[in-house]
């Protein structure tokens, strides 16, 4: 993109949650690359957090944006979930849904699909209430800080989740590598990092605005995770991509890694 890296000030001023949600999470118009990407993530998360999968007391989601789909599986296996985002508007959008305020975004299609994966599509309303009860706080975050939740200090968590966020928050591969080390600092030794990264994406559209990303290769993501003190337990590549007019990525990788006990 011509304007260079999109920093925090631009996100705070110009990132409009409803434009983002309507572009990437609107399923009224039938099948789309965006809907398929959501299904890919929900399927991966179900396998990761479902029966026999990761569980624990505390999970921190870094860079939640205005979305809740990413913790629909985890709310069944963790007791205390923290959502976080850099911008005020995104945190306000999350609060609207959590508090069931008028005009909150309708996540019913995602809730129903998540429940289908669990074998009980009829309990989607129960799932929504379970998630609302499990999310204990919504905090400001900045993955580029040594403590991404500054000024709040939370006890080390069992799991850190970050989907489709780090590549947007970081201005370079070096910054991405540093951000992963920052995320590692939020975890207990032996805790897990769960992440989805869009590959080879240099920018994406939200409404009429273009936001920059660091274009990452699968091998760069893998090496950055290893160098941040993790052992990789699962690395799944998919050619799944968004619509070329909104987010022209080339594939995506889903990764589960365990923080080394001594790190």
Swiss-Prot record:
Enzyme Commission code: 2.1.1.49, 2.1.1.96
Entry binding sites for S-adenosyl-L-methionine: 20, 25, 63-64, 69, 85, 90, 142-143, 163
Keyword match Methyltransferase: yes
Protein location: Cytoplasm
Cellular component annotations (GO), alphabetically ordered: cytosol
Signal sequence bounds: none
Family: Belongs to the class I-like SAM-binding methyltransferase superfamily. NNMT/PNMT/TEMT family.
Protein function: Catalyzes the N-methylation of tryptamine and structurally related compounds. Functions as a thioether S-methyltransferase and is active with a variety of thioethers and the corresponding selenium and tellurium compounds, including 3-methylthiopropionaldehyde, dimethyl selenide, dimethyl telluride, 2-methylthioethylamine, 2-methylthioethanol, methyl-n-propyl sulfide and diethyl sulfide. Plays an important role in the detoxification of selenium compounds.
Protein name: Indolethylamine N-methyltransferase
Species of provenance: Oryctolagus cuniculus
Gene this chain is encoded by: INMT
């Amino acid at each position: 993109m011509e304007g260079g890296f999109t920093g925090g000030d631009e996100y705070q001023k110009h990132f409009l949650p409803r434009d983002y949600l309507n572009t990437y999470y609107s399923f009224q118009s039938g099948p789309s690359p965006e809907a398929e990407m959501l299904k890919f993530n929900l399927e991966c998360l179900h396998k990761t957090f479902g029966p026999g999968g990761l569980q624990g007391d505390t999970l921190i989601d870094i860079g939640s944006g205005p979305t809740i789909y990413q913790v629909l599986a985890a709310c069944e296996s963790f007791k205390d979930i923290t959502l976080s985002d850099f911008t005020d508007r995104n945190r306000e959008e999350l609060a609207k849904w959590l508090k069931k305020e008028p005009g909150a975004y309708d996540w019913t299609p995602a809730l129903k699909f998540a429940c289908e994966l669990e074998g009980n599509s009829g309990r989607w309303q129960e799932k929504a209430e379970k998630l609302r009860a499990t999310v204990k706080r919504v905090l400001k975050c900045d993955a580029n800080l040594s403590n991404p939740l500054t000024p709040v200090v939370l006890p080390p968590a069992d799991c850190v989740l970050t989907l489709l966020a780090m590549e947007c928050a970081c201005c370079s591969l070096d910054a991405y590598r540093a951000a992963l080390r920052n995320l590692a600092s939020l975890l207990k030794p032996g805790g897990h990092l769960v992440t989805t990264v869009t590959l080879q994406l240099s920018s994406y559209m939200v409404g009429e605005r273009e936001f920059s990303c660091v274009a990452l290769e699968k091998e760069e993501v893998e090496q950055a995770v290893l160098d941040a003190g993790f052992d990789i337990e699962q690395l799944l590549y998919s050619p799944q991509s968004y619509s070329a007019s909104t987010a022209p990525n080339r594939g995506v990788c889903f990764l589960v890694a365990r923080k080394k006990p001594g790190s």
